[in-house]
UniProtKB/Swiss-Prot annotation:
This is Lysosomal cobalamin transport escort protein LMBD1. PANTHER family: LYSOSOMAL COBALAMIN TRANSPORT ESCORT PROTEIN LMBD1, LYSOSOMAL COBALAMIN TRANSPORTER-RELATED. Keywords: Cell membrane, Cobalamin, Cobalt, Endoplasmic reticulum, Glycoprotein, Lysosome, Membrane, Transmembrane, Transmembrane helix, Transport. One of its GO terms (molecular function) is cobalamin binding. Belongs to the LIMR family. LMBRD1 subfamily. GO terms for cellular component: clathrin-coated endocytic vesicle; endoplasmic reticulum membrane; lysosomal membrane; plasma membrane. Lysosomal membrane chaperone required to export cobalamin (vitamin B12) from the lysosome to the cytosol, allowing its conversion to cofactors. Targets ABCD4 transporter from the endoplasmic reticulum to the lysosome. Then forms a complex with lysosomal ABCD4 and cytoplasmic MMACHC to transport cobalamin across the lysosomal membrane. May play a role in mediating and regulating the internalization of the insulin receptor. Residues 29-47, 120-142, 208-303, 384-406, 506-539 are cytoplasmic. It is found in: Endoplasmic reticulum membrane; Lysosome membrane; Cell membrane. InterPro entries: LMBD1_LysCbl_Transport, LMBR1-like_membr_prot. Glycans are attached at residues 75, 85, 168, 345, 445-446, 455. It comes from Xenopus tropicalis. The chain crosses the membrane at residues 8-28, 48-68, 99-119, 143-163, 187-207, 304-324, 363-383, 407-427, 485-505.
């Protein structure tokens, strides 16, 4: 057992290193986008902490998979220190406690801390009242989120878990036995239901932003941006044209006659357009003379290579997701069981790759980290291109060094929910890996064969799957926690199809769109001239 404990400690040590790397990444990421003029300590700490907690939770997934895989030898037998079911349960409970803690913190962030900080700054902007009144109003609005959280916990604690279906009773027994491993605690069910509800919202965010970002980001890297010099020449022509239109309207009142309401309205619009064009000219002049713009020309081939790599990775994900969903559609136990699969019938590339990588520790750790970071960057690309919307109303724009505290909190909330959904996405891409890792078991063949001694049964080494004997394979806590309620799994299944459709639509749209402006997102009609100081000084 001492040897096993030492080796298991390696997995947790790497988790600790990842934790530090995650904190550093979140700090750099948030500081990159926050407005330096409107920077607030509380909003910055809240954004960094909430995003870090989500990423740390996702980092538990490879630890969980490593632990269940490490308990078994390559020949399908349990290692000496893991032969006791009690020992295996204790090891897995350490992961479960980790999930308990981190998911509880996520609920606290989503339903209390982030809403409170958001409404506090909204009150700070809208009113000139005292700080006490701002805090009181923020708590008043936050109480609605606390009520929603309480309802989710109550529903989760008492929601029926029985699977009603006319499928084969043997399959039903296997499904029920899987989830009995996690226990029947009402507290655990309540937490699982609440987190699954948030993961459902994360699925909608992933369909909206990540699916589009997976196609937009690589194609933007491949196509590049327009030339700053030629773009500035076009902008100068537009400025001259608008100035001529303004002069024509102003010439009507040279003799002292007042302008008509129609002319006044047209003059106002032209002056606003002229103001925006002049701001664009200042930004284009800066980019035209900027050293970084010249460096981008040199590294352009590398951007094209990265773009090609990203689009290949995106296609790999989509193909794997399609094959996994198709496998569920053809061979699963049905919608009433959450489309659980008994064995892998249609093998996808990622489901084959991850168990192989796990044999050389920590390659699977690195690969899972790359997948999570890929989802983060593509989600960010989608959010930057689209902005944060509520139905048809755009709430906030996300721009480097110019994002307001409220928008930053919204951004980190969306990314937190998307990262929560990442665990299920990885399961969809590699179901066998997420459920059992690289575990194998010995299957006793019922047929007998004659030997010199007599008749004997043959043992076959098989990969663990949902049809394996209960005492031969250990299911990860991640899978059981996120799939305790079968109806969420069914919704996730249809969400995966929606994800594929949105990706294809986004790919077509991105291919049809031309090159982006070199100052894309830097200048908007509703920006003030003072906002230029966020980007760079024009002295």
């Amino acid at each position: 057992m001492a040897t096993g404990s030492t080796e298991l400690l390696i997995g947790w040590c790497i988790f600790g290193v990842l934790l530090l790397a995650i904190l550093a990444f979140c700090w750099v990421y948030v500081r990159k986008y926050q407005s330096h003029q409107e920077s607030e300590v509380i909003s910055t700490i809240t954004a960094i902490s909430s995003l870090a907690i989500a990423l740390i939770t996702s980092a538990l997934l490879p630890v969980d998979i490593f632990l269940v895989s490490f308990m078994k030898n390559h020949n399908g037998t349990f290692k000496d220190w893991a032969e006791s079911n009690t020992t295996r349960l204790q090891i897995e409970n350490t992961v479960l406690i980790g999930y308990y803690t981190l998911y509880s913190i996520i609920l606290f962030c989503v339903f209390l801390w982030i809403p409170f900080v958001y409404f506090y700054y909204e009150e700070k902007d809208d009113t000139d009242g005292s700080q006490c009144s701002q805090i009181a109003n923020a708590f008043k609005y936050t109480s609605g989120f606390i009520l929603v959280c309480s309802c989710l916990l109550l529903i989760g604690a008492f929601a029926p878990l029985d699977i009603h279906t006319n499928k084969n009773s043997t399959d039903l027994d296997k499904i029920k036995l899987l989830f009995l491993e996690l226990g029947s605690s009402n507290g655990l069910a309540a937490l699982s239901f609440s987190i699954s509800s948030l993961t459902l919202i994360g699925m909608l965010a992933a369909i909206t932003y990540t699916a589009y970002g997976m196609s937009a980001l690589p194609l933007n890297l491949i196509k590049g941006t327009r030339n700053a010099h030629y773009e500035r020449l076009e902008n100068s022509e537009d400025i001259e044209e608008v100035e001529q239109q303004v002069e024509r309207i102003m010439s009507k009142c040279k003799d002292g006659r007042p302008l008509s309401s129609k002319d006044r309205q047209a003059l106002y619009k032209l002056k606003e357009k002229l103001r925006t064009l002049k701001r664009r000219d200042r930004h284009l002049e800066y980019h035209e003379n900027n050293c970084w713009t010249k460096c981008c020309i040199v590294i352009r081939p590398f951007k094209i290579i990265w773009g090609i790599l990203f689009i290949l990775v995106a296609l790999l994900f989509i193909v794997s997701l399609f094959l996994s969903n198709l496998d569920k559609a053809l061979h699963s136990a049905g919608i009433d069981s959450g489309f659980i699969i008994f064995g892998t019938n249609l093998t996808n590339p990622l489901n084959m790759l991850l168990p192989v990588l796990q044999t050389v520790f920590p390659l699977d750790y690195i690969f899972i980290t790359i997948i999570t970071m890929y989802f983060i960057f593509t989600s960010m690309a989608g959010i930057r291109n689209m902005g944060i919307w509520f139905f048809w109303i755009r709430l906030y724009k996300i721009r480097r060094r110019r994002t307001r505290p409220q928008a930053l909190l919204f951004l980190c909330m969306i990314l937190l929910l998307i990262v929560l959904h990442t665990s299920y996405m990885i399961y969809s891409l590699a179901p066998q890996y997420v459920m059992y890792g690289s575990q194998k078991y010995l299957w006793e063949n019922n047929s007998t064969q004659e030997t010199a001694i007599g008749n004997s049964s043959a043992s076959v080494l098989k990969d663990c799957d949902a049809s394996a004997p209960e005492d031969q394979c250990t299911v990860t806590r991640t899978y059981l926690f996120l799939h305790k309620f079968w109806f969420f799994s069914s919704i996730y299944y249809f969400g995966n199809w929606a994800f594929i459709v949105v990706f294809v639509i986004g790919l077509i749209v991105s291919c049809c769109k031309g090159k982006k402006s070199v100052i894309e997102g830097e200048v908007e009609d509703d920006d003030s001239d003072l906002s230029d100081d966020e980007e760079h000084p024009y002295a």
